[in-house]
Amino acid sequence: MDTQNDVIMAISQVTEELAKSKFVVGAKQLKKALKNGNARRVFLACNADPAITEPIAALCQQYHVDLAWVRSMNDLGHACGIEVGAAAAAAID
């Protein structure tokens, strides 16, 4: 994450956006949604392994999909309504 160019999104905003839409959780499902053109916005956890987040961030840039960072995997998991942390999630069409 390049903190000079990226903004950490408030978890309340993430929760609200995900509650209003369909979404996928996890790197594999998210990459599939990006490649199929279904992802509207991607959420990545700042404390997730860069081996997971960096390829997804690159795909977001390639497919011109908005990317938002969330402070932690626990926060992102909570926003998705799951009991474990999540490295990545996406609002989909």
Regions found by a protein language model. Give the residues of each.
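Ribosome large-subunit tunnel/peptidyl-transferase-proximal elements
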Residues: 2-38
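Flexible, active-site-adjacent loop/turn segments at secondary-structure boundaries
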Residues: 12, 16, 21, 50, ...
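Amphipathic coiled-coil/heptad-repeat helices and related helical stalk/stem segments
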Residues: 26-27, 52, 72
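Fold-independent oxyanion-binding glycine-rich loops
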Residues: 27-28, 46-47, 92-93
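Short, flexible micro-motifs
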Residues: 29, 40, 80, 84
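N-terminal positively charged helical leader segments and presequences
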Residues: 32-57, 64
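Short basic, glycine-rich beta-strand/loop surfaces that mediate nucleic-acid
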Residues: 58-93
